[in-house]
């Protein structure tokens, strides 16, 4: 078998199925779109759910893809096994109600064994089938496969709950006896068992049943094919690699780490684990950040942060102590450039995000080492020789400390780590994560009600907002097809419509339906795309309507024009942000309504007011320049050559629409727009904020809404001017600065007076001194305005010989505040301020702590301050009694 590169294997797979009438679907973003059940795209079929459950009908029923995916349920195994990865690619071919078992099996055999394609030795191939699936077995026997290489396996049935399910057939490659890690009589020593010899390279799922909510199965209205071939696995076969890590997908990264560390891969088992972890995690982090995810403390951002910190810690185990992971980005980009050119294009941004996170982790790591040293000291103080599993997990979860590193540090101090306890805590976290996630469903139960609506419905809303003599073709009311619309809510299809269906962030049109007499018979309240692409109207029927009758459809013109202005303004905003912030900004979501527009975009860092002013200025200049807005319908490749921006997560058909605003902006867009930018009138940013890790949001208004916003702002400014006794609006900033200066001066005077009062009280607290068993104690209730003054009094006490122990209490606002201090000589005798404060804080319904010589507490019951001071005296008696 001829050696092939990963790029050749990927391209050959896609080309093969393209030759069989499949459309190549580009790899979707790792960040799921419109699917809250998924944290990441975790398989090839995850992006096909809408097709398989019937909610959308694809333009062509045959699809193929190489889909990048992330799975994080077993991160700890990465580096320890031959094939565990966080990021992987899944090659797949899919049939949506088209071909089935016959073609899927024969094509699989052809691709694998034909000299024109993969050219694998047929004697090396084994397949498994579901015992009851005699049809699949019969078809396999039609191929030249050795009949003894067909194995029946009971669990060859793909089923993850409600939705499409069915038997599957797995294909294995026999790597030979040299890879066999089991004894001959081991029950797992067979194709399909847990072993290293027979490597699963492809799984073909025959989706032929609907798993219904009641647990029963029924035949699918439309049978599907869903297959998955792990690219990394197949590459290891073609490159005769012992594990996936010795292939061209990982080795360049490993070689780069060799240069940085001075260590060689393959010489030490423990070091090899670190090399593998870094290579795997670098790929996942690079692609995830490139797709818009950013390190954070929750969700997918937390996954990235955890992977990054794990890779950094493994770098330290290899002796790489400086920031280095960001240097892997161009290496990953070079490996994947044939199919993912965007990685190299975005490498500067991706590397910047990674380096920033590495720098932040270096600071965190210092805190982690401090915590570890504290844990070690506390463990020794307790007389124990074992760091608890809870503490070890706390280090791992908060600071990214691998268990191995914690064990190494502990060993240097003569301690060990409770590994079983650590694993228990790890399991608890996994359970918490599982319960926190939405229940994952691969697909909904397939319904043919909407899928079977094949009536053609032409959208003409780009050219007109009114259509006469539109024929009512289909009616869905009360969950069933009918010919008559009764008063109430219904969904209807017309043969032609001017109503825009919600898409691309633009809300649906609203309007009216009139009968032949001009009487309003229904209101259109929403429009959505049906599975076959028609505009499906949700209406509120006022009178009966009949299928086959002609009606006049009219869009609410005022509503529609406001939406158009905001949509074109959104395109201007998108380009202006790229001009000011950089090309790394990508649209992450939008909402275009008549009242305002909302635009989410990726950006790492804050957006300054100066930047927002520049963006706003550019957009208004383009409005005043009266630039024509044009639309061109063409094919995708021609559109790209025109310079049109494609949204990364959007899928485009054979025909696309390019919306151009002169030479300034070109985007693929199916929405409606003004004819000239001057129709927008005015653009004003209302707010800018962060809505997630690495995602910013701008809200803005245009036209009349922008003018109303500015009028409101001006009225507020006039009110402020009145309060400041300012005759001119332009004087408001100066007057405000004067007011702030006066407030600051008065605040300083108040602070000085309070300090004098505090000093006066500090001089008098000596009168409260009592001696208890040879220890002088001052326990006093004082009057201060803040905790800072209370601490200052305690600091002043340190330099005086008024007592050996001090307890001060004060009511500040509606809270009780306590502070305790112990002179160093008495700390050595065993009196600790932290113990004292913990003993008295409950009296005021509070708690606290601190160092042996200084501690503080707060409580919600200031009425019990006297009781707390008395408790201090009693505590001292108990300590010295």
Swiss-Prot record:
<dbReference type="InterPro" id="IPR018163">
    <property type="entry name" value="Thr/Ala-tRNA-synth_IIc_edit"/>
</dbReference>
<dbReference type="GO" id="GO:0002161">
    <property type="term" value="F:aminoacyl-tRNA deacylase activity"/>
</dbReference>
<dbReference type="InterPro" id="IPR018164">
    <property type="entry name" value="Ala-tRNA-synth_IIc_N"/>
</dbReference>
<dbReference type="InterPro" id="IPR002318">
    <property type="entry name" value="Ala-tRNA-lgiase_IIc"/>
</dbReference>
<dbReference type="InterPro" id="IPR018162">
    <property type="entry name" value="Ala-tRNA-ligase_IIc_anticod-bd"/>
</dbReference>
<comment type="similarity">
    <text>Belongs to the class-II aminoacyl-tRNA synthetase family.</text>
</comment>
<dbReference type="GO" id="GO:0005524">
    <property type="term" value="F:ATP binding"/>
</dbReference>
<dbReference type="GO" id="GO:0000049">
    <property type="term" value="F:tRNA binding"/>
</dbReference>
<dbReference type="GO" id="GO:0140096">
    <property type="term" value="F:catalytic activity, acting on a protein"/>
</dbReference>
<comment type="function">
    <text>Catalyzes the attachment of alanine to tRNA(Ala) in a two-step reaction: alanine is first activated by ATP to form Ala-AMP and then transferred to the acceptor end of tRNA(Ala). Also edits incorrectly charged Ser-tRNA(Ala) and Gly-tRNA(Ala) via its editing domain.</text>
</comment>
<keyword id="KW-0479">Metal-binding</keyword>
<dbReference type="GO" id="GO:0016740">
    <property type="term" value="F:transferase activity"/>
</dbReference>
<dbReference type="InterPro" id="IPR045864">
    <property type="entry name" value="aa-tRNA-synth_II/BPL/LPL"/>
</dbReference>
<keyword id="KW-0694">RNA-binding</keyword>
<feature type="binding site">
    <location>
        <position position="669"/>
    </location>
    <ligand>
        <name>Zn(2+)</name>
    </ligand>
</feature>
<feature type="region of interest" description="Disordered">
    <location>
        <begin position="422"/>
        <end position="445"/>
    </location>
</feature>
<keyword id="KW-0067">ATP-binding</keyword>
<keyword id="KW-0820">tRNA-binding</keyword>
<keyword id="KW-0862">Zinc</keyword>
<dbReference type="GO" id="GO:0006419">
    <property type="term" value="P:alanyl-tRNA aminoacylation"/>
</dbReference>
<feature type="compositionally biased region" description="Basic and acidic residues">
    <location>
        <begin position="422"/>
        <end position="440"/>
    </location>
</feature>
<dbReference type="InterPro" id="IPR012947">
    <property type="entry name" value="tRNA_SAD"/>
</dbReference>
<dbReference type="GO" id="GO:0008270">
    <property type="term" value="F:zinc ion binding"/>
</dbReference>
<feature type="binding site">
    <location>
        <position position="673"/>
    </location>
    <ligand>
        <name>Zn(2+)</name>
    </ligand>
</feature>
<keyword id="KW-0648">Protein biosynthesis</keyword>
<dbReference type="InterPro" id="IPR009000">
    <property type="entry name" value="Transl_B-barrel_sf"/>
</dbReference>
<feature type="binding site">
    <location>
        <position position="567"/>
    </location>
    <ligand>
        <name>Zn(2+)</name>
    </ligand>
</feature>
<keyword id="KW-0547">Nucleotide-binding</keyword>
<dbReference type="InterPro" id="IPR023033">
    <property type="entry name" value="Ala_tRNA_ligase_euk/bac"/>
</dbReference>
<keyword id="KW-0436">Ligase</keyword>
<dbReference type="GO" id="GO:0005829">
    <property type="term" value="C:cytosol"/>
</dbReference>
<dbReference type="GO" id="GO:0004813">
    <property type="term" value="F:alanine-tRNA ligase activity"/>
</dbReference>
<feature type="binding site">
    <location>
        <position position="571"/>
    </location>
    <ligand>
        <name>Zn(2+)</name>
    </ligand>
</feature>
<dbReference type="InterPro" id="IPR018165">
    <property type="entry name" value="Ala-tRNA-synth_IIc_core"/>
</dbReference>
<dbReference type="InterPro" id="IPR050058">
    <property type="entry name" value="Ala-tRNA_ligase"/>
</dbReference>
<dbReference type="Pfam" id="PF02272">
    <property type="entry name" value="DHHA1"/>
</dbReference>
<dbReference type="Pfam" id="PF07973">
    <property type="entry name" value="tRNA_SAD"/>
</dbReference>
<keyword id="KW-0030">Aminoacyl-tRNA synthetase</keyword>
<dbReference type="Pfam" id="PF01411">
    <property type="entry name" value="tRNA-synt_2c"/>
</dbReference>
<protein>
    <recommendedName>
        <fullName>Alanine--tRNA ligase</fullName>
        <ecNumber>6.1.1.7</ecNumber>
    </recommendedName>
</protein>
<dbReference type="InterPro" id="IPR003156">
    <property type="entry name" value="DHHA1_dom"/>
</dbReference>
<keyword id="KW-0963">Cytoplasm</keyword>
């Amino acid at each position: 078998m001829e050696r092939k590169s990963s790029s050749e294997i990927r391209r050959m797979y896609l080309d093969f199925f393209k030759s069989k009438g499949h459309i190549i679907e580009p790899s979707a973003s790792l960040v799921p779109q419109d699917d809250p059940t998924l944290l990441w795209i975790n398989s090839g079929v995850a992006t096909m759910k809408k097709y398989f459950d019937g909610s959308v009908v694809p333009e062509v029923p045959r699809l193929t893809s190489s889909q990048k995916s992330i799975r994080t349920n077993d991160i700890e195994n990465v580096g320890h096994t031959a094939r565990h990865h966080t990021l992987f690619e899944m090659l797949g071919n899919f049939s949506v109600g088209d071909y089935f078992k016959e073609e899927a099996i024969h094509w699989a055999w052809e691709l694998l064994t034909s000299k024109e394609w993969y050219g694998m030795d047929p004697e090396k191939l084994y397949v498994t089938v579901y015992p009851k699936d005699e049809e699949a077995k019969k078809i396999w026997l039609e191929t030249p496969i050795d009949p003894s290489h067909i194995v029946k396996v009971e669990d060859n049935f793909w089923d993850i709950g409600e939705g499409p399910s069915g038997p599957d057939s797995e294909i294995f490659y026999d790597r030979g006896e040299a890879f066999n890690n089991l004894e001959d009589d081991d029950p797992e020593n067979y194709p399909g068992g847990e072993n290293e010899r027979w490597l699963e390279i492809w799984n073909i799922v025959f989706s032929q049943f609907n798993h219904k909510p009641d647990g029963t199965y029924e035949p699918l209205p439309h049978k599907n094919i869903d297959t998955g071939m792990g690219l990394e696995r197949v590459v290891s076969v073609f490159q005769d690699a012992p594990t996936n890590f010795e292939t061209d997908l990982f080795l360049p990264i490993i070689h780069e780490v060799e240069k940085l560390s001075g260590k060689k891969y393959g010489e030490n088992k423990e070091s090899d684990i670190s090399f593998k972890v870094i290579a795997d995690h670098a790929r996942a982090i690079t692609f995830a950040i490139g797709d818009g995810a950013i390190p954070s403390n929750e969700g997918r951002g937390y996954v990235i942060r955890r992977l990054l910190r794990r890779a950094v810690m493994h770098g330290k185990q290899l002796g790489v102590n400086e920031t280095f992971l960001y240097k892997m980005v161009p290496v990953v980009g070079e490996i994947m450039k044939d199919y993912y050119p965007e990685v190299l294009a975005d490498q500067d941004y991706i590397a910047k995000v990674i380096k920033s996170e590495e720098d932040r982790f270096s600071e965190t790591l210092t805190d982690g080492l401090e915590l570890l040293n504290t844990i070690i000291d506390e463990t020794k103080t307790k007389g124990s020789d074992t760091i608890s599993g809870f503490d070890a997990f706390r280090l791992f979860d908060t600071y990214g400390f691998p268990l191995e590193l914690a064990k190494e540090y502990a060993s240097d101090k003569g301690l060990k780590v409770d590994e079983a306890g650590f694993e228990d805590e790890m399991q608890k976290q996994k359970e918490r994560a599982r319960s926190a996630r939405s229940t994952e469903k691969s697909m909904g139960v397939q319904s043919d009600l909407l899928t079977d609506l094949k009536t053609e419905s032409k959208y003409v809303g780009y050219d007109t907002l009114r259509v006469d003599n539109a024929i009512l073709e289909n009616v869905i009311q009360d969950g069933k097809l009918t010919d008559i619309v009764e008063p109430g809510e219904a969904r209807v299809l017309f043969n032609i419509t001017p109503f825009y269906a919600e898409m691309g962030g633009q809300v649906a049109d609203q309007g009216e339906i009139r009968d032949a007499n001009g009487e309003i018979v229904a209101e259109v309240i929403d429009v959505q795309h049906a599975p076959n692409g028609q505009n499906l109207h949700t209406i509120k029927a006022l009178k009966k309507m009949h299928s086959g009758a002609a009606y006049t459809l009219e869009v609410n013109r005022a509503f529609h024009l406001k939406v158009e202005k905001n949509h074109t303004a959104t395109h201007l905003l998108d380009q202006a942000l790229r001009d000011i912030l950089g090309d790394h900004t990508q649209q992450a979501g939008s909402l275009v309504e008549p009242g305002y527009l909302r635009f989410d975009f990726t950006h790492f860092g804050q957006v300054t007011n100066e930047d927002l002013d520049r963006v706003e200025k550019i957009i208004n200049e383009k409005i005043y320049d009266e630039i024509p807005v044009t639309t061109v319908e063409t094919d995708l490749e021609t559109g790209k050559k025109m310079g049109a921006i494609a949204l990364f997560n959007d899928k485009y058909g054979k025909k696309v629409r390019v919306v151009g605003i002169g030479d300034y902006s070109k985007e693929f867009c199916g929405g409606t727009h003004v004819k000239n930018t001057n129709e927008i009138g005015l653009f004003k940013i209302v707010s800018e904020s962060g809505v997630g890790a690495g995602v910013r949001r701008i809200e803005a208004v245009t036209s009349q809404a922008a003018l109303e916003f500015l009028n409101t702002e001006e009225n507020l400014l006039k009110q402020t001017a009145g309060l400041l006794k300012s005759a001119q609006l332009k004087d408001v900033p100066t007057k405000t600065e004067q007011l702030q200066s006066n407030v600051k001066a008065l605040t300083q005077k108040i602070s000085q007076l309070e300090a004098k009062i505090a000093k006066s009280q500090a001089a008098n607290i000596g009168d409260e001194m009592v001696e208890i068993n040879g220890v002088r104690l001052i326990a006093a209730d004082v009057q201060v305005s803040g905790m800072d003054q209370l601490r200052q009094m305690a600091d002043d006490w340190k330099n005086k010989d008024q007592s050996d122990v001090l307890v001060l209490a004060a009511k500040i606002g509606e809270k009780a505040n306590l502070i305790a201090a112990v002179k160093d000589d008495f700390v050595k005798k065993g009196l600790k301020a932290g113990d004292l404060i913990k003993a008295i804080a409950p009296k005021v319904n509070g708690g606290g702590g601190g160092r042996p010589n200084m501690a503080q507490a707060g409580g919600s019951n200031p009425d019990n301050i006297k009781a707390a001071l008395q408790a201090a005296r009693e505590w001292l008696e108990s300590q010295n009694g």
